Amino acid sequence: MMSEKVRVAITGGSGRMGRTLIEAARQQPMIYLGAVIERAGSTLIGVDAGELAGVGSMNVPITDSLDLAVDDFDVLIDFTSPEASLVHTDWCAKHGKAIVIGTTGFNHSQKEQISAYAEKTPVVMAPNMAVGVNLLWKLLEVAAEVMGDYTDIEIIEGHHRYKKDAPSGTALKMGEVIAETLGRDLDKCAVYGREGITGERDRQTIGFSTIRAGDIVGEHTALFADIGERIEITHKASSRMTFANGAMRAASWLVEQDAGLYDMQQVLGLK
């Protein structure tokens, strides 16, 4: 059981998620915010992180250099872009810092790079830090085992108009969980959207539909549909704080782990 505060740093502090992470760090008594990093040339360099997040002064001026903050934190929390996350993970591996990665949109090669860095430092990488979503994945395993081979499976996800990647990392993870449970290869059975004359649906496929609109924080539904009945398993997030709190929980857990690549299922003791 930890008795000392976990020292964290946050990258991309000016973004919507970054500001929420700062607020979460302020709220949690066992978290100490040591640094907030922004891109070089940002007009926010030197601004107090707490003032930026609207939670009052925290005496943490925003910097543009991880090197300058190297002695101020033990775990980096990163919700940026795949390219930036790779740079940050490389830096952490070289400097003995753990890292929690909530970034989505990685390609296969980038994921392999993260795995290589994780041989040198502890890494939690998860497309969704919300506790409820990670429970959702366990429920999907059960549903797929019981109904998967006898139903049409669709995954529907919705996010705000500013989200850059589609389908979301969470939706893809849902597909991976279902496909793995059923012994299928998601790369071969996934159908991303439909248009025109598509013909009768192939039951071996897993369909994906994406919504980008307004300020939707995050909604995900897995649909198992047969003739005469269907089951829908849904998670809806109404605030980014659920992701931020999950990231803080991951940081608190990760600081006590050896080098390796972990996910939120392990953080939460679900596997």
Swiss-Prot record:
Its EC number is 1.17.1.8. GO terms for biological process: diaminopimelate biosynthetic process; lysine biosynthetic process via diaminopimelate. The keyword Signal does not apply. Coiled coil: none annotated. GO terms for cellular component: cytosol. Pfam families: DapB_C (PF05173), DapB_N (PF01113). One of its GO terms (molecular function) is NAD binding. NADP(+) binds at residue 39. It is an enzyme of class 1 (oxidoreductase). (S)-2,3,4,5-tetrahydrodipicolinate binds at residues 160, 169-170. This is 4-hydroxy-tetrahydrodipicolinate reductase. It comes from Shewanella woodyi (strain ATCC 51908 / MS32).
